Regions:
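Terminal domain-start leader segments
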Residues: 1-199
């Protein structure tokens, strides 16, 4: 999968999508939701079914995160994407924030109302991100809440299916070692550490 520079976005679609997401957030009992440009694998390239940030905002850059509250929304991007973020999003919906100067945790600490409850999909954030966000919200009496269901996925009616392709085993010359040797070493490590599983 390679990044496409021919992607066209339509910011006019965002208003209806954000409204549906906000209704879902109200049903879930949260004030806001974080939408990163990430998938469950934290890779640089995400499949179409994981382009949540592009779907909700219109922004198609390769890095960013949106914070959508009931009354306001922000798109955090680094300097590479400031102009693209402004061009691809509805300025009546999204305020562009410099991700480097004001990371989401720092922003939430100072800009969200006391007691704000922000939901997130724990599959789409690293543990370190979640800790920073939880700490920032906690300082204002708020909470970061891991949601069982991604509310954006629930309102994305025409979401593409996940990719389904055959698994390809790389020859030893590319992988360095045979898969059976790697698995044997992993099994030995599990046994040596008295673990029952490895992820």
């Amino acid at each position: 999968m390679f990044q496409s520079f021919d992607t066209v976005s339509d910011p006019s679609l965002a208003a209806g999508r954000v409204a549906r997401l906000r209704a879902r957030l109200a049903q879930a009992g949260v004030d806001g939701f974080l939408v990163p440009r990430a998938d469950e694998h934290q890779g640089e390239y995400v499949p179409a079914c994981a382009e949540r940030l592009a779907w909700i905002t219109g922004f198609t850059g390769s890095a960013g995160v949106a914070l959508i509250m009931q009354d306001k929304a922000w798109l955090f991007v680094d300097g590479r994407y400031t102009l693209q973020g402004r061009a691809q999003t509805d300025p009546g919906l999204f305020e562009i924030v410099d991700l480097v100067e004001t990371p989401p945790a720092a922003f939430m600490r100072t800009r969200l109302p006391a007691g704000a409850r922000v939901g997130f999909d724990p599959w789409l954030h690293t543990i370190d991100e979640a800790r920073k966000l939880r700490k920032a919200l906690g300082e204002g009496g708020g909470a970061l809440l891991a949601l069982d269901e991604n509310p954006l996925d629930a309102v994305w009616q025409d979401r593409p299916a996940p990719p389904l392709k055959p698994v390809a085993i790389h020859p030893e010359r590319y992988a360095g070692r045979l898969a059976r040797d790697k698995l044997a070493e992993l099994a030995a490590t599990i046994a040596d550490t008295d673990a029952s599983h490895a992820v």
